[in-house]
Amino acid sequence: MKVIIADDSKVVVERLVDLLRDIEGVQVVGQAGNAVEAIDAIRQMNPDAVILDLQMPGGSGLDVLRAIRPEHPGLYILVCTNYPYPQYREECLSAGASHFLDKSAEFEKIPAIFDDLIRDAAKAIPGASQG
């Protein structure tokens, strides 16, 4: 599973890379520090999943979500933000986010989410789990 991380915080990006490194089948293929880079990276790399910050330079994660969702309907989009307000959650999920997490309280759920995604993908491909 190819993953792009779009977040303007280098510390957060490093933590996410560390969390995902130990998950078999997950490969971080790109990083973006602002909204424009995120849209370009998604269009160029065609990932399976994106971890998307809500507040970034050059536009919001919601702007990225609205720009890419029509082009990539099967893309798994995990919004991970320090702004977990209900109105943002509702707006992101309505715009097509697959999941919405509070960085400060739910960050450690990310490995389990990706474990589930890998497991579900293996079930969808006959014989994939047999190696």
Question: What label would you give each PLM region?
Answer:
Residues 1-12, 16, 20:
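Conserved acidic segment of CheY-like receiver
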Residues 25-33, 41:
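Short hydrophobic/Thr-rich beta-strand motif most characteristic of the beta2 strand and flanking loop
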Residues 34-37, 60-63:
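Acidic catalytic/metal-coordinating carboxylates
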Residues 45-51:
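Active-site beta3 strand of CheY-like receiver
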Residues 57, 85:
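The feature encodes the CheY-like receiver
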Residues 87, 105-115:
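C-terminal output helix
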